[in-house]
Amino acid sequence: MLDADDFEAWFRLLETPGLGREGARRLLAAFGSATQVLQASKAARQQVVGPPRAQAFDTEPEELSTRLRAAQAWLGGGEGRRVLCIGDDAYPAVLLQTPDPPLLLYVQGQVEFLNRRSLAIVGSRNASAQGLDNARAFGAHLSQHG
């Protein structure tokens, strides 16, 4: 499980505009952790992802701290909420088999279920009201039937 400092480092790494997941993956492979990526010199990061992507760390976007506080509030806002990074023991093995697994997972509920046989409902980050209603209805129906 990530502590508060590790979560902030992961969040900053993944929310840096212009870096992308591929850039984040390369930096993580080179430096070992999100915290070490942020502690690395600009020159060291440039060697891994090139100058334009490395420069993305020079300025922190204004909205980053607002989004970070919102994510932290979500984490502290209910029982069973946590964040798993791709190296976490509880990270779902099946996701590691996909071409581009998420580097962070926001989880609510019992993490031990993540490695059981399951069904995923995949949607949009910007779902319509109807789409959200449909997802809730599908989820409720499926959970009632095991």
Kindly label every feature range from the protein language model:
Residues 1-145:
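Short, positively charged patches
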